């Protein structure tokens, strides 16, 4: 799982994570290398700004984003030209960014680049529509914003990879995040006609702890737009599901949970998970990539 080009080919895959420096961009680079090794040239973009050498707040070194000749990449025009990739501009997107116009370009030479992409769901959807409608790329990877899985819902059929990093001090928190996300991604689509029956509620807004507590005891089923509208912690969610059914209007597929461990054994991490969550976990699949081996 997530260690073959076939896991990404012909798909739109968002790479997400709960916090900065969780390994998102490193995983993106790994996935891109797999796709290229299979003879395909992917398209990729970031939601917002990424790719600087060091984080502006922590000064921690961030991985650069390599580009191969033939790749299609989205970024500010100035960064496309600074990356020495000899870009062929395919499209200039409406609006702009703090770094100037954002463009879709095809690289004619290999290099490294700073990614600057659209900020909102509408902007992401616009880019994906262009890439698919114009036949620019069959395989698309998106470096998603921190803790914003809602962006995946901007494109029907897209899926996401959740990357988290943990050490001994953060082990329990990481396990809770993994369990919660795994459970949310298994929620079933709302049945046809749901909401018309007794004890059925179609929520227009988010499901919070306060909302859940205010539901009458007679309510046996609740539906939300998608699982990103569920704001219940792992324990709260499991308690809610023990007495009620929870459905989603738009299911979002989880392709896997990538666990980057520091000073924690794989067995120790897995011991904190239920069977369903453990089956979704991949450990550092980018430890040896085609690029690293070259």
PLM-predicted stretches and their roles:
Residues 12-18, 106-118:
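Short, basic, glycine/proline-bearing loop/turn elements
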Residues 1-9, 37-40, 270-294:
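N-terminal charge/polar-biased segments
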Residues 25-28, 53-57, 173-174, 268-270:
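Short, glycine/acidic-enriched capping/hinge loops at junctions between secondary-structure elements
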Residues 120, 124-277, 290:
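Conserved catalytic-core segment of NTP-binding enzymes
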Residues 31-107:
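N-terminal phosphate/diphosphate-binding loop that engages ATP/GTP or pyrophosphate donors
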Residues 17-19, 46-49, 78, 144-146, ...:
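Short glycine-rich, polar/acidic loop-and-turn segments at beta strand-coil junctions
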Residues 22-23, 51-55, 149-151, 170:
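Short active-site-adjacent helix-start/loop capping segments
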Residues 2-52:
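Walker A (P-loop) phosphate-binding motif
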């Amino acid at each position: 799982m997530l260690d073959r080009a076939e896991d990404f080919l012909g798909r739109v895959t968002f790479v997400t994570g709960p916090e900065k420096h969780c390994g998102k961009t490193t995983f993106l680079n790994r996935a891109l290398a797999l796709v290229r090794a299979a003879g395909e040239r992917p398209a990729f973009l970031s939601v917002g700004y990424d790719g600087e050498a060091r984080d502006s707040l922590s000064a921690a070194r961030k991985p650069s984003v390599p580009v191969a000749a033939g790749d299609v990449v989205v970024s500010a025009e100035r960064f496309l030209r600074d990356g020495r990739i000899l870009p062929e501009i395919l499209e200039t997107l409406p609006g702009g960014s703090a770094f100037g116009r954002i463009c879709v370009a095809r690289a004619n030479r290999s290099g490294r680049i700073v990614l600057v992409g659209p900020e909102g769901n509408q902007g992401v959807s616009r880019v994906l529509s262009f890439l698919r409608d114009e036949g620019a790329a069959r395989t698309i990877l998106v470096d998603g914003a921190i803790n914003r899985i809602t962006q995946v819902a901007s494109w029907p059929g897209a899926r996401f990879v959740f990357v988290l990093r943990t050490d001994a001090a953060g082990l329990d928190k990481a396990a809770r995040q993994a369990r919660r996300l795994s459970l949310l991604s298994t929620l079933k689509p709302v049945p046809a006609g749901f909401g018309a029956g007794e004890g059925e509620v179609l929520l227009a807004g988010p499901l919070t702890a306060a909302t859940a507590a205010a539901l009458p005891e007679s309510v046996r089923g609740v539906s939300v737009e998608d699982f990103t509208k569920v704001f219940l912690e792992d324990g709260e969610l499991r308690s809610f599901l023990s007495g009620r059914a929870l459905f989603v209007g738009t299911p979002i597929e989880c392709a896997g949970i990538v666990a980057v461990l520091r000073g924690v054994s794989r067995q120790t991490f897995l011991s904190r998970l239920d069977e369903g969550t453990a089956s979704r976990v991949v450990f550092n699949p980018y430890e040896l990539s085609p690029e690293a081996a070259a």
